[in-house]
């Protein structure tokens, strides 16, 4: 999603609104992910793309997050390119722009960088993570089945456990975005067999 690329942004916005309306109609949760993209011959490593990435991520959340139940956001900046203070400011702006609970995607960055991104995002208001490649991409570098199994069992499992511990300690509860407290949720009772109507 590129808010300044009006033709594609308008089409994507209309699609997001339509899909969210259908999900509400059928009582389905919608997770929406928007990613910044290079255009006009850029690559994701070009300064022109990197210069606008944070603003694209923040503005995308402002525009799109109302059309979902959970918003999946990119990290608004680049570790080592912007200062920690700038990245923290970007994350606070992302949090303020998102109308829904948001989680951080990994975009395939190296695990150590993702761990730093997760820490910063959780302290800025993220409710959790929805990462993939940062946890397991080295799996494909293993030369045999035993190596792949060992990687998943030892390395990937530990990574997931470490990030899970971070989320449990520092994540913002999703329900606070909707104005609820833990006490409010504690009063909710579901009728036995409620799920059969689905």
Ranges and model annotations:
Residues 75-179:
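Catalytic-face loop-and-helix region of soluble metabolic enzyme cores
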Residues 31-44, 103-104, 171-182:
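Aromatic-lined carbohydrate-recognition surfaces of secreted/lumenal glycan-active proteins
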Residues 170-198:
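C-terminal extensions of enzymes
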Residues 33, 71, 132:
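Conserved, mostly hydrophobic/aromatic
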Residues 51, 157, 182-185:
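Low-complexity, intrinsically disordered regions enriched in charged/polar residues
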Residues 3-21, 25-29, 37-100, 116-127:
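Alpha/beta enzyme core
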Residues 45, 136, 143-144, 185-189:
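Charge-rich, low-complexity amphipathic helices
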């Amino acid at each position: 999603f590129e808010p300044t690329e009006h033709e594609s942004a308008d089409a994507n916005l209309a699609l997001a609104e339509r899909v969210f309306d259908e999900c509400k109609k059928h009582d389905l949760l919608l997770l929406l992910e928007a990613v910044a993209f290079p255009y006009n011959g850029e690559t994701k490593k070009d300064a022109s793309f990197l210069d606008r990435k944070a603003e694209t991520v923040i503005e995308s959340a402002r525009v799109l997050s109302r059309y979902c139940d959970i918003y999946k956001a990119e990290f608004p900046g680049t570790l080592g390119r912007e200062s920690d203070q700038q990245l923290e400011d970007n994350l606070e702006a992302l949090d303020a722009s998102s109308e829904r609970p948001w989680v951080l995607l990994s975009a395939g960055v190296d695990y150590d960088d993702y761990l730093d991104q997760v820490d910063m995002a959780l302290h800025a208001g993220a409710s959790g993570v929805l990462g993939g490649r940062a946890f397991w991409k080295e799996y494909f570098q293993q030369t045999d089945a035993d190596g792949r199994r060992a990687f998943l069992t030892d390395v990937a499992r530990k990574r997931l456990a470490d990030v899970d511990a971070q989320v449990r300690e520092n994540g913002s509860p999703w329900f606070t975005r909707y104005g609820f407290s833990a006490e409010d949720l504690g009063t909710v009772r579901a009728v036995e067999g409620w799920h059969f109507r689905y």
